[in-house]
């Protein structure tokens, strides 16, 4: 719970989450549970001696790549459709409790496929979790297939082709493509051909850029057709590019606690929330990999409020822009915008 007088307002504010990796919702207790269920041996090192030791280690990441090592080890416990469904359901319950009404979630099939897990097992499990969230919690959900930059392009191409062969984009089992993992090092345009193919088919595109990499990584992602930028905090270093992002209504999916935990910023106050608001940059606030970074979406909202002391009107702008930048139909957008307006009006009437 944040210390701000606006905590109850922030808790009840209808939220959209656009930047959360389902594999990043593998809490230590679930990792140990699934490892036991699936007879998976975890590494013989101090961090994996207990749930408590792993939780402690998660609070001391030194970089993006340090985090990614633990992230990919965690994935190794996921074997069966029910494992993926349980993981998704665990996230959606927490998101719902934090006031999320719509969630667009990443999944990383390449890493699982390299472990011998069939693509269909992965997708079927996550779809089951999404359907349960829609049925029992009233959330709307979208799955975004996420390429990883530390694996070869032909590896991503095989997964992309599987999704096409199963018509997952046409029948909206999968609603878009993204990329993530190591930012600095691999070629900025490594997915050029895949993004060109997807763009020609009308598939929605997003990309992790401008987290550790400089603004040129954002420019490269936009040039390849990205319609959203995940992270994007280094956009402020290029005023001309920032003007373009504002003009073209490109939404950033900002993850404040993640940026802090991975040492991208020295404090939440260094995340350019105020600069984005003043410049008119569209952005949403998200949790990224909440089980690893110790904060789900409400924790991120509270951290931003404690750092910036935003007004109700500023939060309204953030919430409304998060809806406008969502990959949902106009009817659902109108419904969610109405919920925000109702919530704001109730708050104003009560103070």
UniProtKB/Swiss-Prot annotation:
BP term (GO), one: adenine catabolic process
Site residues by UniProt (Important for catalytic activity): 231
Compartmental location: Cytoplasm; Nucleus
Keyword Nucleus part of the UniProt annotation: yes
Residues annotated to bind substrate: 289
Co-factor note (free text): Binds 1 zinc ion per subunit.
Cofactor: Zn(2+)
Protein name in UniProt: Adenine deaminase
Organism expressing this protein natively: Aspergillus oryzae (strain ATCC 42149 / RIB 40) (Yellow koji mold)
């Amino acid at each position: 719970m944040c210390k701000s007088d606006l905590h109850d307002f922030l808790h009840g504010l209808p939220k959209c989450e656009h930047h959360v990796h389902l594999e990043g919702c593998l809490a230590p207790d679930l990792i140990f549970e699934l490892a036991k269920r699936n007879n998976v041996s975890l590494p013989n090192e101090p961090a994996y001696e207990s749930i408590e030791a792993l939780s402690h280690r998660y609070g001391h990441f030194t970089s993006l790549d340090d985090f990614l090592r633990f992230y990919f080890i965690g994935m190794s416990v996921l074997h069966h459709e029910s494992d993926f469904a349980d993981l998704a359901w665990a996230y959606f319950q927490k998101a719902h409790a934090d006031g999320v009404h719509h969630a667009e979630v990443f999944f990383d099939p390449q890493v699982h496929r390299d472990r011998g897990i069939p693509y269909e097992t992965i997708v079927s499990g996550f779809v089951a979790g999404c359907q349960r969230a829609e049925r029992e919690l009233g959330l709307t959900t979208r799955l975004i297939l996420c390429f990883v930059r530390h694996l070869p392009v032909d590896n991503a191409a095989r997964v992309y082709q599987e999704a096409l062969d199963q018509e997952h984009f046409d029948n909206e089992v999968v609603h878009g493509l993204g990329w993530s993992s190591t930012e600095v090092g691999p070629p900025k345009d490594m997915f050029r051909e895949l993004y060109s193919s997807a763009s020609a088919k009308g598939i929605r595109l997003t990309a992790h850029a401008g987290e550790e990499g400089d603004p040129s990584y954002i420019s490269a992602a936009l040039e390849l057709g990205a319609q959203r930028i995940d992270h994007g905090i280094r956009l402020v270093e290029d005023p001309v590019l920032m003007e373009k992002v504002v003009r073209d209504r490109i939404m950033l999916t900002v993850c404040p606690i993640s940026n802090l935990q991975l040492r991208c910023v020295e404090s939440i106050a260094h995340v350019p929330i105020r600069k984005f608001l003043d410049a008119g940059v569209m952005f949403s606030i998200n949790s990224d990999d909440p089980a690893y970074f110790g904060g789900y979406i409400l924790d991120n909202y509270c951290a931003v409020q404690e750092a910036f002391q935003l007004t109700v009107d500023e939060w309204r702008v953030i919430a409304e822009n998060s809806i406008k930048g969502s990959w949902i139909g106009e009817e659902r957008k109108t419904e969610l915008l109405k919920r925000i307006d109702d919530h704001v009006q109730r708050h104003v009437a009560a103070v």
